[in-house]
Every structure is written in structure tokens, then in C-alpha cells.
Amino acid sequence: MIEFGRTDRSVVGRWWWTVDRWTLAVCLLTMAVGIVLIMAASPAVADRIGLRSFHFVWRQILFLIPALIILFGMSLLPVVWVRRIAVVGFLMSLILLVGTLLVGESFNGARRWIDFGGFLFQPSQFAKPTFAVFTAWMLSHRVAQPGFPGYTLASVVALILIGLLLMQPDVGMTLVVATVWVTQMFLAGIPMAAVAVIAVIGAAGAVGAYALFPHVAARIDRFLDSSSGDTFQIDASLNAFGNGGLFGTGPGEGIVKTILPDAHADFIFAVAGEELGLIASLAIVALFAFLVLRCLVRLLRETDLFVVLASGGILVQIGLQAVINMGVNVRLLPAKGMTLPFISYGGSSLLALAIGMGFVLALTRRRPGVVTTKTHTGEMQRSAPPALASQGGAA
């Protein structure tokens, strides 16, 4: 077993004693849970569509290996390199999103994927974490240079990304991106009057989505009135939780995976509820809650606004996505095809999440021994007071 002493000055040694090992452990545990649940849920799906039983399992493992490398590699980066990589990555994501609209693969009326040698690549997944860091950079730079139009530029970038997502269309991803943007603007100290205006615009956007996108209207209608349309998938998901009880039917003994086409993706939480039971399902909820809250508590002691905004944006993205997926599975929210982070099948999602959490691990690493230094934005960083308090109540 490799051990690192506190005096070890190697790159890995310094990383080991400064990274949040609890957050890292929860990330790895959640990935492991995902592989186990995909092994339980996907063979029935693969058999139903004529593929080898472990087709989806092996493909997920194929993506898991680079995801682990990315997670560890990104967590080694200094703050300035997180920003640089995210800026380049976000600009590339925008180009790929435009390419998706032109030459992408269309499924169920949505054009969200690009085919790379038999692998479907979803650029919007990679836009989410890089967007959070990109806008955090612009908003924090406004503090270092008061004349810099950080609010305006961040808003323009958000609107461009939202526009590209709506053209696919992908209303769920749009909701996640918009929530990240609003959260970051709020943390950056935007006036409350502007927050009220954004809330009104958001409400108008929700009404517009209902009016303009028939599939959105149908899902909301079915959520409010189950007799207004087909609710087979949600009903099957609810029955799965009922069948599972407290301790589940046992691994491999569930039924819901044999009747739902996306049991290995959007409804993998229902598979967990049926085969592992309520207690295991609550443990999965606890994993996500711990992951988000642990990092947020760590950010309370942070003095670099860029770190707070970037990490906070990524955590909001992951937390909201988990809430939406699990909420849909138990019919607390209208149906929406959104994967459960680190657990559902999906290569693009897994790699993008590894990038995002790698960024968070890098940004939240302890930087001991520095009393007063300049950050990459030119701000003066001190060990105290906490970041949110130092922003004059911006949070």
C-alpha cells in the first residue's frame, strides 16, 4: 500500500494531503454503485433489442476507465489551469453544439448527438461543467476590475448556450444551465431587483416552453392529470418501489427492467428501488446529499470568488440533475429524460461528470500557508474571512 507523508513534496504527495478525500471517496463509491446497477438493469434491456447481455455494461466500463483518469488528472490542476481548460472546452462545446444541429443524429425528434465511429457523443454534457467555470471567471473578474462587464458577458454567454439547447430541443438541459447561471449571478452579488426580473423572465420562459413544445406540454399535463395520456413508464417505476419494499426483491430479481426501455438510464433509480429496496434507495440519495453539502461547506471557508462561483455552479448542476432524475422516478416531478449522475448508463455523461468533479476537487483543495496572495484574476486572497462574508453579503 502506497503511503504519503505530510512532508512529501511530490505532485501526488501534495495532492493527497490537500484534496478533499471524502468527496473523492464518495465520487468513486457512486461510480461503483452505478456499475453494479447497470449490471442489474441493462442485460434485460440489451436482450430485448437483440444485443449481447452485457453490451451496456462493457461499454460503461470502457468509459469508466478514462473517466477515472480524467477525474484524478483534473483534480491535480492548479486553479489557473482549471480556468484555462474550461474556457477552451466551453468554446469547443459551442462549436460542437452548432455541428450537432447541422449533422447530428436525431432520436425521438431531438438532435443532440454526434456519431463518432459508433459511439454517440453528446456535446451538451460537456458544455455544462465548462460553462459554470467560464461564467465564474467572467463574474469574478468583475470584482478585480470593476469596469469589466461581467454580468453582461455572463448573461450573453448563457443566452447563447440556452438558445443552442432549445434548438435541439433539450428543455431539461436548458433548465439546468439556466439554474446554474442564476445561482452564480446571485452569488456574485447581483442586485435583488435584477433577481426579480430574472425570476419573471424564467416564469415567462416556462410558460413559453409549455406553449411551444408539445412534448413538454404533454408531460406536464400527464403529471397534473394522469388520465390525460399514457403514464405507463411512471406507473411501472412507482410499482417497482412498491415491489421492492424496505430491502428489495434481491439483485437480478426485479421486473421493471424487463418492461422499461430506459431502465439502465433514466429509470435506473427505479431498478435500485425494486431490487435493493427503500433503504438502499435512501442511501443513494444520501450519497448525493453528502457530495453536494460537503463541497458547499468547504466553499464557506474559501476566499477566492472564482472558486466559489465555479465550484458552486458545478455542484448545482449535479445536485439538480440528481433531484430531477429521482423526482421523476417517484412521480414528484413531470417526466424528463435526464440521467442520474455517475450511476445511469451514458459515456458522455460519465466523462463530463468526471471533468466537472475533477474541477471541483482541484478548486477546493486546501492551499495552506498563504496569508495574502494574488489570485489568477488579480484579487488579493487571504485565509479569512470566509468568501461569502467577504463579498458583503453577496450570497
Say what each PLM segment does:
Residues 1-17:
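Short, Lys/Arg-rich, polar N-terminal cytosolic tail immediately upstream
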Residues 5, 216-217, 248-251, 292:
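Short acidic (Asp/Glu) and glycine-rich catalytic loops that position anionic groups and cofactors
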Residues 24-40, 46-233, 270-328, 355-359, ...:
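Hydrophobic alpha-helical transmembrane segments of multi-pass inner membrane proteins, especially
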Residues 32, 331-374:
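Transmembrane alpha-helices of multi-pass inner-membrane enzymes
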Residues 117-127, 167-169, 245, 249, ...:
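Glycine/serine-rich anion-binding loops at beta->alpha junctions
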Residues 245-279:
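Long extracytoplasmic/lumenal interhelical loops at the membrane interface
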